[in-house]
Design a protein with these regions (language model features):
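Active-site metal-binding core of divalent-cation-utilizing nuclease and nuclease-like domains
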Residues: 3-43, 47, 158
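Conserved N-terminal glycine/acidic-rich loop preference
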Residues: 32-46, 88-104
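Short acidic loop-to-helix transition motifs that present clustered carboxylates
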Residues: 33, 55-56
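Active-site ExK catalytic segment of metal-dependent nucleases
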Residues: 47-54
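Catalytic cores of nucleic-acid endonucleases
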Residues: 56-100
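Non-catalytic C-terminal interaction segments of nucleic acid-processing enzymes
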Residues: 96-186
Length: 186
Protein backbone atom coordinates (compact mmCIF):
# COMPACT_ATOMS: atom_id res chain seq x y z
CA UNK A 1 0.00 0.00 0.00
CA UNK A 2 1.20 3.52 -0.79
CA UNK A 3 1.72 6.09 1.94
CA UNK A 4 0.03 9.46 1.49
CA UNK A 5 1.00 12.78 3.07
CA UNK A 6 -1.80 12.43 5.65
CA UNK A 7 -0.44 9.01 6.67
CA UNK A 8 3.08 10.39 7.13
CA UNK A 9 2.76 13.69 9.07
CA UNK A 10 1.74 12.69 12.59
CA UNK A 11 4.02 9.62 12.75
CA UNK A 12 6.85 11.81 11.38
CA UNK A 13 6.32 14.35 14.16
CA UNK A 14 6.42 11.59 16.78
CA UNK A 15 9.59 10.11 15.22
CA UNK A 16 11.36 13.49 15.23
CA UNK A 17 10.27 14.32 18.79
CA UNK A 18 11.66 11.01 20.02
CA UNK A 19 14.87 11.42 18.00
CA UNK A 20 15.56 15.10 18.72
CA UNK A 21 13.76 15.91 21.96
CA UNK A 22 12.54 19.49 22.13
CA UNK A 23 11.11 20.48 18.74
CA UNK A 24 8.19 22.57 17.51
CA UNK A 25 6.41 22.12 14.21
CA UNK A 26 4.71 24.69 11.99
CA UNK A 27 2.76 23.25 9.06
CA UNK A 28 2.21 24.71 5.59
CA UNK A 29 4.54 27.69 6.12
CA UNK A 30 4.76 30.21 3.29
CA UNK A 31 8.32 30.67 2.00
CA UNK A 32 8.45 33.14 -0.85
CA UNK A 33 6.43 31.74 -3.73
CA UNK A 34 6.41 28.23 -2.30
CA UNK A 35 4.99 26.55 0.76
CA UNK A 36 7.01 24.42 3.14
CA UNK A 37 5.14 21.31 4.21
CA UNK A 38 6.70 21.54 7.67
CA UNK A 39 8.99 24.00 9.41
CA UNK A 40 10.68 22.37 12.41
CA UNK A 41 12.35 24.43 15.12
CA UNK A 42 15.14 23.07 17.33
CA UNK A 43 17.18 24.93 19.96
CA UNK A 44 19.46 26.53 17.39
CA UNK A 45 18.08 25.84 13.92
CA UNK A 46 15.03 26.14 11.72
CA UNK A 47 14.66 23.09 9.48
CA UNK A 48 12.54 22.61 6.37
CA UNK A 49 10.78 19.30 5.76
CA UNK A 50 9.37 18.62 2.30
CA UNK A 51 7.13 15.54 2.20
CA UNK A 52 7.00 13.54 -1.02
CA UNK A 53 4.51 10.75 -0.46
CA UNK A 54 4.20 7.82 -2.82
CA UNK A 55 1.43 9.75 -4.64
CA UNK A 56 3.57 12.88 -5.24
CA UNK A 57 5.69 13.76 -8.26
CA UNK A 58 8.86 15.83 -8.58
CA UNK A 59 7.13 18.48 -10.74
CA UNK A 60 7.51 21.36 -8.24
CA UNK A 61 10.54 20.10 -6.32
CA UNK A 62 13.21 22.11 -8.17
CA UNK A 63 11.42 25.39 -7.37
CA UNK A 64 10.68 24.26 -3.80
CA UNK A 65 14.37 23.48 -3.21
CA UNK A 66 15.30 27.05 -4.22
CA UNK A 67 12.92 28.54 -1.66
CA UNK A 68 13.72 26.07 1.12
CA UNK A 69 17.40 26.91 0.65
CA UNK A 70 16.73 30.62 1.17
CA UNK A 71 14.87 30.21 4.46
CA UNK A 72 16.10 27.14 6.37
CA UNK A 73 19.34 26.18 8.13
CA UNK A 74 18.90 22.52 7.18
CA UNK A 75 16.51 20.76 4.81
CA UNK A 76 15.13 17.26 4.58
CA UNK A 77 12.95 15.53 2.05
CA UNK A 78 10.72 12.89 3.62
CA UNK A 79 9.86 10.27 1.02
CA UNK A 80 7.67 7.27 0.48
CA UNK A 81 9.52 4.15 -0.62
CA UNK A 82 8.60 4.69 -4.28
CA UNK A 83 10.96 7.70 -4.39
CA UNK A 84 14.00 6.10 -2.76
CA UNK A 85 15.68 5.11 -6.03
CA UNK A 86 15.59 8.56 -7.71
CA UNK A 87 15.30 11.25 -5.03
CA UNK A 88 19.05 12.02 -4.96
CA UNK A 89 18.81 13.18 -8.59
CA UNK A 90 16.37 15.91 -7.53
CA UNK A 91 17.89 17.43 -4.38
CA UNK A 92 21.27 18.95 -3.44
CA UNK A 93 23.89 16.82 -1.67
CA UNK A 94 23.48 18.82 1.57
CA UNK A 95 19.79 17.96 1.89
CA UNK A 96 18.91 15.09 4.19
CA UNK A 97 16.67 12.19 3.24
CA UNK A 98 14.21 10.43 5.53
CA UNK A 99 12.52 7.38 4.07
CA UNK A 100 9.20 6.09 5.37
CA UNK A 101 7.57 2.71 4.87
CA UNK A 102 4.62 0.89 6.32
CA UNK A 103 5.51 -1.58 9.01
CA UNK A 104 2.38 -3.37 10.14
CA UNK A 105 0.10 -0.73 11.66
CA UNK A 106 2.94 1.78 12.04
CA UNK A 107 4.93 3.97 9.73
CA UNK A 108 8.67 3.27 9.97
CA UNK A 109 11.27 5.99 9.38
CA UNK A 110 14.91 5.74 8.42
CA UNK A 111 17.35 8.61 8.01
CA UNK A 112 18.97 7.63 4.73
CA UNK A 113 21.17 10.74 4.60
CA UNK A 114 21.77 13.35 7.29
CA UNK A 115 21.35 16.98 6.25
CA UNK A 116 24.40 19.26 6.23
CA UNK A 117 24.33 22.97 7.06
CA UNK A 118 22.71 24.96 4.27
CA UNK A 119 25.15 27.73 3.33
CA UNK A 120 22.62 29.38 1.00
CA UNK A 121 20.25 30.39 3.82
CA UNK A 122 19.54 34.14 3.97
CA UNK A 123 19.36 35.36 7.59
CA UNK A 124 17.01 38.19 6.64
CA UNK A 125 14.54 35.71 5.14
CA UNK A 126 14.88 33.36 8.11
CA UNK A 127 14.14 36.28 10.43
CA UNK A 128 11.02 37.09 8.39
CA UNK A 129 9.32 34.20 10.24
CA UNK A 130 9.35 36.39 13.37
CA UNK A 131 6.56 38.73 14.36
CA UNK A 132 7.39 42.36 15.19
CA UNK A 133 7.13 41.82 18.95
CA UNK A 134 9.54 38.88 18.69
CA UNK A 135 12.02 41.06 16.81
CA UNK A 136 11.56 43.77 19.45
CA UNK A 137 12.30 41.25 22.22
CA UNK A 138 15.60 40.32 20.55
CA UNK A 139 16.41 44.01 20.01
CA UNK A 140 15.84 44.83 23.71
CA UNK A 141 18.16 41.99 24.73
CA UNK A 142 20.98 42.50 22.26
CA UNK A 143 21.17 46.08 21.02
CA UNK A 144 22.38 48.82 23.38
CA UNK A 145 21.13 51.74 21.34
CA UNK A 146 17.41 52.30 21.05
CA UNK A 147 16.07 52.24 17.53
CA UNK A 148 12.53 53.55 17.29
CA UNK A 149 10.12 53.66 14.39
CA UNK A 150 11.92 51.04 12.34
CA UNK A 151 9.96 48.91 9.89
CA UNK A 152 10.19 45.15 10.36
CA UNK A 153 12.64 44.99 7.44
CA UNK A 154 14.82 47.74 8.96
CA UNK A 155 14.68 46.05 12.37
CA UNK A 156 15.80 42.72 10.85
CA UNK A 157 18.66 44.48 9.05
CA UNK A 158 19.76 46.25 12.25
CA UNK A 159 19.76 42.96 14.22
CA UNK A 160 21.76 41.21 11.49
CA UNK A 161 24.27 44.06 11.61
CA UNK A 162 24.59 44.14 15.42
CA UNK A 163 24.15 40.51 16.60
CA UNK A 164 26.35 37.55 15.63
CA UNK A 165 24.74 34.79 13.59
CA UNK A 166 25.06 32.02 16.17
CA UNK A 167 23.31 34.15 18.80
CA UNK A 168 20.59 35.09 16.31
CA UNK A 169 20.02 31.42 15.45
CA UNK A 170 19.39 30.60 19.11
CA UNK A 171 17.21 33.66 19.72
CA UNK A 172 15.09 33.03 16.62
CA UNK A 173 14.51 29.46 17.78
CA UNK A 174 13.64 30.63 21.29
CA UNK A 175 11.12 33.15 19.98
CA UNK A 176 9.49 30.57 17.71
CA UNK A 177 9.32 28.06 20.59
CA UNK A 178 7.73 30.68 22.84
CA UNK A 179 5.26 31.98 20.24
CA UNK A 180 1.80 32.35 21.72
CA UNK A 181 -1.09 32.24 19.27
CA UNK A 182 -3.60 33.36 21.91
CA UNK A 183 -2.33 36.94 21.66
CA UNK A 184 -2.80 39.26 18.72
CA UNK A 185 -0.22 39.23 15.94
CA UNK A 186 1.17 42.36 14.34
Amino acid sequence: MSLLDKDIREPLFMYLEIKLGKVRFFEEKEIGRARADVMMVTDDAVIGLEIKSDADSYARLKRQVRYYDKYFDYNYVVIGKSHLKHIEEHIPKYWGIISCTEGGEDVQFEEVREASKNTKRDMNLKMSFLWRRELETIKRECVKFKYYDLSKAQLRAKLIEKVDEQTLDKLISRELFDRDYTTLVD
